[in-house]
Amino acid sequence: MPDRRLFFALWLSDRQRELLRDTLRPVLTSVEGAVVDRRDWHVTLVFIGAFPDEQIPFLQAAAGEIEPEPIRLRFDRLDFWQRAKVATLMPRAVPPALEALVRSLEKTLEAFDVKAEDRLYRPHITVARRARNFETVPLTRPVDLEWQDFDLMESVSGPSGARYRPLKQ
């Protein structure tokens, strides 16, 4: 079987997507770029990359042993990332529970010979790609989102770009 492109993420519920959509609507009108379909909004925890299909059940079982603390993020601004040319919704701070979850996932992935990225973890939700440069936009009303769990996600390429879907056990 071929490899699949995977990552761990905090997947947004329909209610969370609607809340963000309503909050971002007035802000996104000032952003030039391709707005990401809200059905694909997520917070990446750890990028895995190409992963053997036959190993996925073992990865799911190993990740299933992790019991994360509840995670709460307060998103309060829209930032532009120059190198990636994306508009990202950013939280005010990174809670210890989120840092602990990322470390646990990275440790779990070591058993599968997946090395953690060597860069600072910055939780975010990408809301536009191929964006033009803009100044940071503070949200008039910060948005608090909470998660009790995380998902193993697959990135599936299609004619209109990548789409994301959770892989359920």
Each model region followed by its residue ranges:
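Histidine-dependent nucleotide/RNA phosphoesterase domain, centered on the 2H-phosphoesterase fold
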Residues: 1-169
